[in-house]
A protein has these predicted regions:
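Surface/interface-facing alpha-helical segments and adjacent flexible terminal/loop regions used
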Residues: 1-153
Length: 153
Protein backbone atom coordinates (compact mmCIF):
# COMPACT_ATOMS: atom_id res chain seq x y z
CA UNK A 1 0.00 0.00 0.00
CA UNK A 2 1.41 3.36 -1.02
CA UNK A 3 1.76 6.02 1.64
CA UNK A 4 0.14 9.28 0.73
CA UNK A 5 2.55 12.15 1.31
CA UNK A 6 1.08 15.31 2.79
CA UNK A 7 1.81 18.58 1.02
CA UNK A 8 4.65 20.50 2.65
CA UNK A 9 2.39 23.18 4.15
CA UNK A 10 0.08 20.58 5.73
CA UNK A 11 3.03 18.81 7.34
CA UNK A 12 4.39 22.10 8.66
CA UNK A 13 0.94 23.10 9.91
CA UNK A 14 0.59 19.85 11.84
CA UNK A 15 4.16 19.70 13.17
CA UNK A 16 5.26 23.33 13.65
CA UNK A 17 2.46 25.86 13.63
CA UNK A 18 4.81 28.79 14.17
CA UNK A 19 6.90 27.87 11.11
CA UNK A 20 3.70 27.40 9.10
CA UNK A 21 2.42 30.84 10.11
CA UNK A 22 5.74 32.48 9.14
CA UNK A 23 5.69 30.66 5.79
CA UNK A 24 2.14 31.81 5.08
CA UNK A 25 3.04 35.41 5.97
CA UNK A 26 6.04 35.29 3.64
CA UNK A 27 3.91 33.89 0.80
CA UNK A 28 1.36 36.67 1.31
CA UNK A 29 4.06 39.36 1.37
CA UNK A 30 5.62 37.97 -1.80
CA UNK A 31 2.26 37.75 -3.59
CA UNK A 32 2.59 33.97 -4.06
CA UNK A 33 -1.10 33.38 -3.45
CA UNK A 34 -1.35 30.10 -5.35
CA UNK A 35 1.02 28.52 -2.82
CA UNK A 36 -1.02 29.52 0.24
CA UNK A 37 -2.56 26.87 2.46
CA UNK A 38 -5.98 28.48 2.10
CA UNK A 39 -7.96 25.92 4.05
CA UNK A 40 -5.86 26.26 7.17
CA UNK A 41 -5.37 29.99 6.64
CA UNK A 42 -9.13 30.60 6.57
CA UNK A 43 -9.58 28.43 9.66
CA UNK A 44 -6.87 30.32 11.57
CA UNK A 45 -8.20 33.76 10.65
CA UNK A 46 -11.66 32.74 11.86
CA UNK A 47 -10.15 31.30 15.04
CA UNK A 48 -8.30 34.56 15.71
CA UNK A 49 -11.57 36.48 15.64
CA UNK A 50 -13.24 33.92 17.87
CA UNK A 51 -10.40 34.02 20.39
CA UNK A 52 -10.54 37.80 20.53
CA UNK A 53 -14.31 37.70 21.07
CA UNK A 54 -13.94 35.18 23.91
CA UNK A 55 -11.24 37.32 25.50
CA UNK A 56 -13.37 40.48 25.37
CA UNK A 57 -16.38 38.68 26.83
CA UNK A 58 -14.25 37.16 29.59
CA UNK A 59 -12.72 40.51 30.51
CA UNK A 60 -16.12 42.19 30.68
CA UNK A 61 -17.51 39.39 32.86
CA UNK A 62 -14.54 39.68 35.20
CA UNK A 63 -14.86 43.46 35.44
CA UNK A 64 -18.59 43.24 36.16
CA UNK A 65 -18.06 40.48 38.74
CA UNK A 66 -15.53 42.59 40.61
CA UNK A 67 -17.57 45.81 40.35
CA UNK A 68 -20.50 43.93 41.88
CA UNK A 69 -18.31 42.65 44.72
CA UNK A 70 -16.88 46.13 45.30
CA UNK A 71 -20.38 47.56 45.48
CA UNK A 72 -22.07 44.85 47.55
CA UNK A 73 -19.46 43.15 49.72
CA UNK A 74 -18.83 44.59 53.17
CA UNK A 75 -15.46 42.80 53.40
CA UNK A 76 -12.54 45.25 53.56
CA UNK A 77 -9.64 42.86 52.93
CA UNK A 78 -10.17 41.72 49.33
CA UNK A 79 -11.10 45.16 47.97
CA UNK A 80 -7.56 46.05 46.90
CA UNK A 81 -7.32 42.89 44.83
CA UNK A 82 -10.70 43.55 43.23
CA UNK A 83 -9.62 47.08 42.28
CA UNK A 84 -6.37 45.75 40.84
CA UNK A 85 -8.23 43.14 38.81
CA UNK A 86 -10.65 45.71 37.37
CA UNK A 87 -7.78 48.05 36.48
CA UNK A 88 -5.80 45.28 34.75
CA UNK A 89 -8.82 43.93 32.85
CA UNK A 90 -9.85 47.42 31.70
CA UNK A 91 -6.30 48.12 30.55
CA UNK A 92 -6.20 44.96 28.44
CA UNK A 93 -9.76 45.47 27.20
CA UNK A 94 -8.81 48.84 25.67
CA UNK A 95 -6.58 47.00 23.19
CA UNK A 96 -9.22 44.40 22.29
CA UNK A 97 -12.65 46.04 22.24
CA UNK A 98 -13.18 46.99 18.60
CA UNK A 99 -16.39 48.65 17.34
CA UNK A 100 -17.71 45.37 15.91
CA UNK A 101 -16.97 43.45 19.11
CA UNK A 102 -18.60 46.22 21.13
CA UNK A 103 -21.79 45.75 19.08
CA UNK A 104 -21.69 41.99 19.71
CA UNK A 105 -21.19 42.53 23.44
CA UNK A 106 -24.07 45.00 23.55
CA UNK A 107 -26.33 42.50 21.77
CA UNK A 108 -25.49 39.80 24.33
CA UNK A 109 -25.08 42.06 27.36
CA UNK A 110 -27.87 40.57 29.50
CA UNK A 111 -26.42 37.08 29.20
CA UNK A 112 -22.91 38.32 30.00
CA UNK A 113 -24.27 40.07 33.08
CA UNK A 114 -26.13 36.96 34.23
CA UNK A 115 -22.91 34.96 34.14
CA UNK A 116 -20.91 37.69 35.90
CA UNK A 117 -23.63 37.99 38.54
CA UNK A 118 -23.58 34.22 39.09
CA UNK A 119 -19.78 34.30 39.46
CA UNK A 120 -19.98 37.18 41.96
CA UNK A 121 -22.74 35.44 43.92
CA UNK A 122 -20.76 32.20 44.10
CA UNK A 123 -17.67 34.04 45.30
CA UNK A 124 -19.59 36.02 47.91
CA UNK A 125 -21.41 32.95 49.20
CA UNK A 126 -18.16 31.01 49.38
CA UNK A 127 -16.86 33.65 51.78
CA UNK A 128 -19.98 33.68 53.93
CA UNK A 129 -21.53 36.81 52.42
CA UNK A 130 -24.92 35.30 51.63
CA UNK A 131 -26.82 38.56 52.19
CA UNK A 132 -24.52 40.40 49.78
CA UNK A 133 -24.95 37.64 47.20
CA UNK A 134 -28.74 37.78 47.57
CA UNK A 135 -28.68 41.57 47.12
CA UNK A 136 -27.04 41.47 43.70
CA UNK A 137 -29.36 43.11 41.15
CA UNK A 138 -31.00 40.87 38.57
CA UNK A 139 -30.41 43.44 35.80
CA UNK A 140 -27.02 45.00 35.19
CA UNK A 141 -26.76 48.31 37.05
CA UNK A 142 -23.80 49.43 34.93
CA UNK A 143 -23.56 50.69 31.38
CA UNK A 144 -20.94 49.34 29.02
CA UNK A 145 -19.25 52.75 29.15
CA UNK A 146 -19.04 52.50 32.95
CA UNK A 147 -17.67 48.96 32.72
CA UNK A 148 -14.99 49.88 30.19
CA UNK A 149 -14.18 53.36 31.52
CA UNK A 150 -12.77 54.82 34.72
CA UNK A 151 -16.05 54.65 36.65
CA UNK A 152 -16.20 53.03 40.09
CA UNK A 153 -19.22 52.18 42.27
Amino acid sequence: MATRIKPKSNRIYDEDFYAWSREQADLLREGRYAELDLGHLIEEVEDLGGALKRSVRSRIRTIVEHLLKLEHSPAPDPRGGWYDTVIAQRSDLIDELTPSLRREVEADFARLYDRARADAATSLQKHGEVAAADALPTACPYTLDQITGDWWP
